[in-house]
Design a protein with these regions (language model features):
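C-terminal soluble interaction/assembly domains
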Residues: 240-370
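Hydrophobic h-region of N-terminal signal peptides that target proteins for export
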Residues: 9-20
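Acidic/His-rich structured neighborhood in mature extracellular/periplasmic domains
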Residues: 77-219, 223, 233
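Flexible, glycine-rich surface segments
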Residues: 171, 175-297
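Sec-dependent signal peptide recognition
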Residues: 2-10
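Acidic helix-start/capping segments at beta-turn-to-alpha-helix junctions
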Residues: 48-73, 121-125, 135-138, 236-245
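Solvent-exposed loop/turn segments at secondary-structure junctions
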Residues: 55-58, 124-128, 181, 299-301, ...
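An acidic, Gly/Ser/Thr/Pro-rich helix-cap/linker signature
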Residues: 21-107
Length: 370
């Protein structure tokens, strides 16, 4: 009997093979072109022999997953509820307590709240428990050949080959998600090359198994995308039907490179949101706030979000993801925080120094005892 999954896989195959064959090379020809370009970029032949040898056909499963991402398919409210289950909040609090000193140190160095670091890790890999088993090179090769986002994934394929060429990880261990996201932090290869941190100073940026490198890499990514240490991400709010109509008529939508950025309003002063009828969840006036706030609305829940929300969208440009990350951090970092209260209840990390030092750098600066 034909299963639903088999039908989905057949549909996925048809989606990326429907275009005329004359418009693109066969998969084998594509891989040959990748090999030639990689050699011209300085990737060692031995690396390519190992990385490309066993890739026979493009993966229909990978294409299927690319068409049905949870953040894009599930309504915001359902996605958030699934990722804020009590067991996930408890697991986050346990990790926060177990690595308290290390997380406080990294939070202070990068200006990112420890609870946010842990919350992102919870969404990305269930607090490090699962980071994917799919061979990264094969997944990226499929997506680079598929025309939907070919240019993006072609860049990521060469970045992954560069990681192997540098010896950061052995090829058999280079596994991750269907989209080529790697390690507990689920960095795509280009993000790894730019933001991964060797915090423990052992010579490897190990986002797969070393807690210090994992936490610092997340913090470095958030800092690098504009997370401000002295600010919050946002808060849940209450909006009446009349207020929603006024907002739709009077407030402009934002421009942006991804759909999520276009599905939110421009930033307005809190006083303006008050005048439009936006209230706290318990119906009170919004408290004073210095930064402008934008409005993000799902089917039944709405949020005022600040500048730091943009940093969350940089990790994954979907409102369901960014809202879930912020709320999960709130729950992990503040046991008694009621639903919708902002991350002001989470102790702020101090302003980061100009150039955070890894533990290896710190050790090198200590006077020798010999």
């Amino acid at each position: 009997m034909v299963t639903v999954r088999a039908l989905l896989l057949a549909l996925a195959v048809s989606l990326f093979t429907a275009q005329p064959e004359s418009s693109r090379p066969s998969f084998a020809e594509f891989l040959a072109g990748v090999r030639a370009e990689a050699l011209s970029r300085g990737i060692r032949e031995a690396v390519l022999d190992e990385a490309l040898a066993d890739i026979g056909e493009p993966s229909a499963v990978v294409i299927e997953r690319d068409r049905t991402q949870a953040e894009a398919v599930l309504p915001l409210e359902k996605y958030v509820d699934q990722r804020l289950m009590p067991r996930q909040i408890a697991a986050g609090r346990e990790m926060l307590a177990r690595h308290h000193d290390l997380l406080e140190e990294i939070g202070a160095a990068y200006g990112v709240p420890p609870a946010l670091i842990v919350g992102i890790l919870g969404l990305e890999s269930n607090f490090g428990r699962f980071s994917g088993v799919r061979p990264t090179i094969a997944a990226l090769a499929t997506l680079a050949w598929d025309p939907r986002r070919s240019a993006l994934f072609r860049r990521e394929l060469f970045a992954a080959l560069e990681i192997l060429n540098r010896g950061d990880i052995e090829f058999p261990k280079l596994r991750g998600s269907w989209a080529g996201a790697m390690g507990q932090v689920q960095f795509i290869p280009s993000s790894y090359l730019k933001f991964a941190v060797d915090y423990d100073g052992d010579g490897r940026r190990d986002i797969w198994a070393t807690p210090a490198d994992v936490f610092a890499s997340i913090a470095n990514y958030m800092q690098g995308h504009g997370w401000a240490a002295d600010a919050t991400w946002g808060r849940e709010v209450k909006i009446s039907g009349n207020a929603k109509r006024r907002i739709a008529n009077e407030v402009e939508r934002r421009d942006g490179t991804c759909q999520a950025r276009r599905d939110m309003t421009t930033g307005l002063p809190v006083e303006r949101w008050r005048a439009l009828g936006v209230r706290t969840l318990n119906g009170q006036r919004l408290p004073p706030a210095t930064p402008n706030a934008a409005l993000v609305s799902g089917r039944s829940r709405s949020f005022l979000v600040y500048q730091n929300y943009d940093a969350l969208l940089e990790y994954n440009c979907a409102h369901s993801y960014a809202i879930a990350a912020g709320l999960l951090a709130d729950r992990i970092g503040a046991r008694q925080a009621p639903r919708g209260e902002p991350t002001q209840q989470i102790p702020k990390a101090p302003q980061p120094p100009q150039a955070p030092r890894t533990r290896g750098q710190q050790a090198a600066e200590k006077p020798s005892l010999k």
